[in-house]
Amino acid sequence: MIPRLPRYFLKYFIIFTFFCVTFCFLKLCLGENGVEKKNHKTIEAYQYTHTFIHSAYYYPKSKSLGENAVVLVTTMNKRTMWKILDYKINMIGTNQSTHHTTRASLSTEHRIIERCDYMLIIAQTNSIDNMDKLEIEAEGVLVEIPYKKPIYIAPKPVIFCVSPQFAAEQWQTFLVQLHVSKRYGAHLQLYIVSMVESYFNLISEYEKMGLVSIEPWLTIKFSSTDGPYLEPNRNVELRNQAGAHTDCLLKYKESASFIGSLDMDDILIPNNANSYYEEFEREYAGSQFISALHYDKYDYKTIKVSELRSQSLSAIVKNAERLSTKDTGKSFVRPERFNSTWSHWSRAAQKKPIYLDGYEKPILRELKTISNNGMFHLKNMYLTEFNDLGIGQIPLNPTDNVTQLIEREHLAEIDADMKRMLSMPSISKLADSLPKEEFYMPIIFKCYNESFYHLRDTNQMRPDILCVNAYSCDLPQQVGNRCVHSDATYHSGPPMWPISFHFATNSFFSRDIGCYQ
């Protein structure tokens, strides 16, 4: 005879089983103290490496990064592991009452197949309200990272980010770039590695007037390590120019309407527009499908004179001769559409899916190459006596060979403004100290040509074979004409696996280092 079960046994058994299953499920999904336990993908590291943090930004609010965004601009060794972009960095944000740990995703403007071992890596996450402390954590080891907030009021709606200058001496190019940009409504953000002191003093006078912002671009240094490491400056693309351009983009992305990345000798003159803002708005035309505006660079040779009082944009323009070559162009962007950039354009500019409110499917933005304008690239400038200058004509726009490169009225305005400013006592007193002849430029050009220009110009440069870098260029120091060089207080965090982090504070310009990269 089968024994009879107690009354309601089945009901109690079902309830008991339900609670047991629920308890086991919660134990699996929750860690201690009720904190959610996430099953993160394990990334196997190959080696212990070092990363230099150029800058860290905290955005309480952002148009494109979200609230409490944190972004790090770094030079990182991609060979730390097989797929460096799969790695996540634990970041801890702390405010007055609590702390919050998130895992920052990594991205880059470079292709992983490229030869350079070090490359620009962006680390991005969203942290905590009113953050007042930022730390990186790995296996219980912490390092505090200094950070800054972006600029929320831009000097002008258009910002031009100029590539880091090293052993810079051609001050005439700066005057052209500054006065053309000033006339058409752009503010220059300039990064300097090293520069002839008198040239630096000239730029500093323009900085005092609010026409240019100067920032040291630091040589990468690991101040303390517990073993040998691969030298980063020699194994990264051109002093990590992309890092400087990305830093500039992040600095102004909440305040500027347009941001461009260019070299000092890349001169952009609007076509059939009174300002850069007018031209960029016209070319974007309110479209959500345009990622960036891309301008080709047309090479020119022209003259330069050594006397400060004789500087004239008209003389440079009217003695310019178009060369048969073109150089890789530059891009100008709406900053809310990008979080990083390469030196010429962002890798995210072409066919990257973007999800917008009200759209069920992503849109694919594309780079727009400007067909009716290009950059006036001052590729070669030859010293000429002022009295020997010829009187030529304004060159034609290289894209149509019909319109003039610059309107006569605008050229006259810029000349008058340049003459007025160069006659100011604070600037005119620098005339005798500025370089009167070339010293570093021929050396650098020769080294660049031997290192990679000859390969680029013959279409033989393969990024998977050659790391574009000229750190080994031998730069002799010029007697009696010293340079300023970027410097800072360098810091190294504790050893961490697999990456130890290094950074700098209190950057400044030193007169005791010399003209080096």
UniProtKB/Swiss-Prot annotation:
The record gives the membrane topology as: Single-pass membrane protein
Q: Where in the cell is it found?
A: Membrane
Concerning InterPro entries, the annotation shows: Glyco_transf_92, GTase_92
Q: Does the keyword Chaperone apply?
A: no
* Transmembrane annotation, as ranges: 9-31
Q: Name one Pfam family in it.
A: Glyco_transf_92
Protein's name according to its UniProt entry: Glycosyltransferase family 92 protein F55C10.4
Q: Which GO terms describe its molecular function?
A: glycosyltransferase activity
The record's principal subcellular location, in a coarse class, is membrane
What are the annotated disulfide bridges? none
Q: Name one GO cellular component term.
A: membrane
Similarity comment: family membership = Belongs to the glycosyltransferase 92 family.
EC id: 2.4.1.-
Keywords, A to Z, come to: Glycosyltransferase, Membrane, Transferase, Transmembrane, Transmembrane helix
Give every GT92 domain span.
Answer: 156-454
